[in-house]
Curated annotation (Swiss-Prot):
Protein name (record): Conotoxin reg3j
Expression sites (tissue/organ): Expressed by the venom duct.
Top-level taxonomic group: Eukaryota
UniProt free text on domains: The cysteine framework is III (CC-C-C-CC).
Keywords: Disulfide bond, Hydroxylation, Secreted, Toxin
Family the entry assigns: Belongs to the conotoxin M superfamily.
Keyword Transmembrane helix: no
List of residues that carry 4-hydroxyproline: 5
One Gene Ontology CC term in the entry: extracellular region
Localization per record: Secreted
Disulfide bonds: 2-16, 3-14, 8-17
UniProt entry tagged with the keyword Protein biosynthesis: no
Example GO molecular function: toxin activity
Length: 17
C-alpha cells in the first residue's frame, strides 16, 4: 500500500513519511 515502510519516496508522495 501507499504507506509501506520500504518506499519512503512513495510515502512522501502520499504524505505518509
Amino acid at each position: 500500500g501507499c504507506c509501506s515502510p520500504w518506499n519512503c519516496i512513495q510515502l512522501r508522495a502520499c504524505g505518509c513519511c
